[in-house]
């Protein structure tokens, strides 16, 4: 345990941020999984809406600083290409 007052405060804020980031990442993984499952099922309409929702959540995670923008771009690109392969 820290003895310095400012470090005790930092520990509290870091813990809050960790829990917030964990919640965002968890919902993000769920959205991506739903999109992948819709693609595997072959439902084009459901897949496009799921990918749109996942892309939106990825962008929000980037703006909150939870994930890097390039990581989000890679995930969005992969999901979009899977949906495009369904439509072709």
From Swiss-Prot:
Q: Name one GO molecular function term.
A: structural constituent of ribosome
Matching entries from Gene3D superfamilies are given as:
Ribosomal protein S20
Q: Where is this region: Disordered?
A: 1-27
Entry GO CC: cytosol; small ribosomal subunit
Recite the UniProt keywords alphabetically: Ribonucleoprotein, Ribosomal protein, RNA-binding, rRNA-binding
Q: Which GO terms describe its biological process?
A: translation
Q: Which InterPro entries match?
A: Ribosomal_bS20, Ribosomal_bS20_sf
Can you tell me which family this protein belongs to? Belongs to the bacterial ribosomal protein bS20 family.
Please explain the role this protein plays, according to its UniProt record: Binds directly to 16S ribosomal RNA.
Q: What NCBIfam families is this protein classified in?
A: S20 (TIGR00029)
List the HAMAP family hit by this protein, alphabetically: Ribosomal_bS20 (MF_00500)
Give the protein's recorded name: Small ribosomal subunit protein bS20
According to its UniProt entry, this protein's organism is: Streptomyces griseus subsp. griseus (strain JCM 4626 / CBS 651.72 / NBRC 13350 / KCC S-0626 / ISP 5235)
Gene name as annotated? rpsT
């Amino acid at each position: 345990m820290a003895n310095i007052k400012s470090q005790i405060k930092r520990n509290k804020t870091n813990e809050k941020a960790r829990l917030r980031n964990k919640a965002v990442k968890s919902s993000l993984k769920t959205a991506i999984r739903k999109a992948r499952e819709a693609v595997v099922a072959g439902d084009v309409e459901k897949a496009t809406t799921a990918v749109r929702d996942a892309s939106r959540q990825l962008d929000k995670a980037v703006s909150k600083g939870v994930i890097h923008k390039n990581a989000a771009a890679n995930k969005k690109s992969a999901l979009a290409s899977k949906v495009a392969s369904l439509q072709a």
